[in-house]
Amino acid sequence: VQVLLGNGFYNEQGGRYHKLKVSFGPPTLLLALHITYHDGSKETIVSDAAWQWSLSPITFNSLYGGEDYDARISSTTWHPVVVQQAPKGILRPQLAYPVKVMEHYEVAQTLRRDSILVFDMGQNLAGFPEITVKGKRGQHIKITPAETLTDDLRCNQKQTGRPHYYTYTLSGKGTETWHPVFS
């Protein structure tokens, strides 16, 4: 079992736009996975001191500030987890519907300003970008969403909070497709 943890509201990262000014600590996991097999047998997998952690290609994630992904990182170095003391109080589930992609939008218009491309979606929408690119190892792509543009075609984030952006660092291994996972 592998689990990818993001910061969420629990550990709001600074350095970019964020609404919360507090952090409750690093991402933490308490897992009890109940499995019922086709033959009726059951198994429970729980997170404990035997689990391990490793870095991921996601080097920054914030609900409001964006996400950075370095496709060159493929860590195979595993470390023992740090077992934390259980919080006080009664553990209650937090029920939430999954985030689903409801619709894909194509770019309505592409504008160029020097080495910067501006992709106009043709409407205001809530969503996240997905890119498919091919390039050299270590090349960086920065995606800055905005509701409006300045007169010189720069992103204007005054209405939405700033700075908010995504970066993707290419692995250089052929065609690469990426979209943020945690923002």
State each model region's role.
Residues 2-183:
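Extracellular/oxidizing-compartment recognition motifs
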